[in-house]
Structure formats: structure tokens, C-alpha cells
């Protein structure tokens, strides 16, 4: 027959439900925050406070934030930067968010055990910051499709995320008079 649930079993079950609700509400809040930021960035309704930013320092700090996660996934990070300081006029918060979104994308979709290349190039006039990695999934979509909001490759549907990261990164880059291009070649992903 049926056995009655003890008080401790009921408490355990309720505690598990509460944890699930909390996790789901955090995901929903992140989605709403990302949507709001994407909307503001796309429409130009996001404040931009340009200042002189040291790209090398900012990129190194952002890469440092991902060091443990990359290590857990056996990703080897190779950073190549000019010896001289590379400075740009940008909003440091927005540039940080661009780096964070791109590194988070790499963490989620890079082939475990592969290399991640972060390059800063400066030709005297333009500064290029290049993120390159091998994808764990076939890159069957065009770069334009990958930049669209809510777009995620079919093979990555089971991964955490809402498909806004690249779209936000592109909008924030353009908002600061920059340009972001995605290049795919087989399983090579380059921004």
C-alpha cells in the first residue's frame, strides 16, 4: 500500500522544490537582464562613457577570471600581445562585458582539451582583439546567423545559455564605434 511521507521526507522534498525554483528564477532574472541590455545596446539607449583603456590589462584580467573554468575543461589559453601598451577609447565596463561574453562563449562551446588564442594586434592606427578556439560542435550556421539574438547551434541546445551573448557583444562593440566579425572555418571559431 501507500506509505505516509514522514515530516523529514516532506521537508527534504520541499527544500528540493525551493532550490529548483531559486535556480529557475535566477536564470529568468539573467535572461531578463540580458534582454534589457541587448535591447538598450541595439537601440543605442545605453550610456557610453569613453575613457582611455589599456586593452592588454583588461584582456588579461578577463582571461584571469576564466582561468579556473578553462583549466577544468583542459583549455590551454595562449595570449599574444604587443610589448607596448595598447590603449583604446572605450567604455571599460562595456568592453569588459564584450570580453566576458566572448570568453563565456568559448568556455561553453570550445572543444575540451584544445587551445584558446587571445591576440591583441595594433598596426599603429587600428587595434584588433582576436578570440579563436576550436568548437566542440559542428559550425553549420553562417556567422550572420550566429550573431542573431537567441541563436544557438542545434548540437548545443542542451547547454546553459540564452543565445544572447554574441548579439550583446556585437551591439556593445558597435555602440563604441568598433566592429565585431565572426569567422568560421570547419570547427574553427574566430571573433
Task: Describe each PLM feature range.
Residues 20-28:
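Short alpha-helical segment of the dimerization/phosphotransfer core of two-component systems
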Residues 43-48, 87-90:
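Conserved micro-motifs of the catalytic ATP-binding
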Residues 138-151:
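Short conserved segment of the HATPase_c
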Residues 177-178:
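Conserved glycine-rich
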Amino acid at each position: 500500500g501507500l506509505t505516509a511521507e514522514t515530516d523529514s521526507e516532506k521537508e527534504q522534498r520541499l527544500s528540493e522544490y525551493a532550490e529548483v525554483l531559486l535556480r529557475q528564477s535566477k536564470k529568468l532574472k539573467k535572461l531578463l537582464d540580458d534582454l534589457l541590455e541587448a535591447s538598450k545596446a541595439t537601440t543605442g539607449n545605453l550610456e557610453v562613457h569613453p575613457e582611455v583603456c589599456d586593452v592588454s590589462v583588461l584582456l588579461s584580467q578577463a582571461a584571469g577570471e576564466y582561468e579556473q573554468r578553462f583549466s577544468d575543461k583542459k583549455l590551454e589559453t595562449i595570449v599574444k600581445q604587443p610589448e607596448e601598451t595598447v590603449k583604446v577609447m572605450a567604455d571599460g565596463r562595456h568592453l569588459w562585458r564584450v570580453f566576458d561574453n566572448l570568453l563565456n562563449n568559448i568556455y561553453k562551446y570550445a572543444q575540451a582539451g584544445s587551445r584558446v588564442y587571445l591576440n591583441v594586434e595594433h598596426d599603429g592606427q587600428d587595434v584588433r582583439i582576436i578570440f579563436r578556439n576550436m568548437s566542440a560542435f559542428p559550425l553549420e550556421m553562417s556567422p550572420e546567423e550566429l550573431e542573431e539574438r537567441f541563436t544557438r547551434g542545434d548540437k548545443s541546445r542542451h547547454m546553459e545559455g540564452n543565445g544572447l551573448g554574441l548579439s550583446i557583444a556585437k551591439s556593445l562593440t558597435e555602440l563604441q564605434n568598433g566592429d565585431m566579425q565572426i569567422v568560421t572555418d570547419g570547427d574553427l571559431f574566430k571573433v
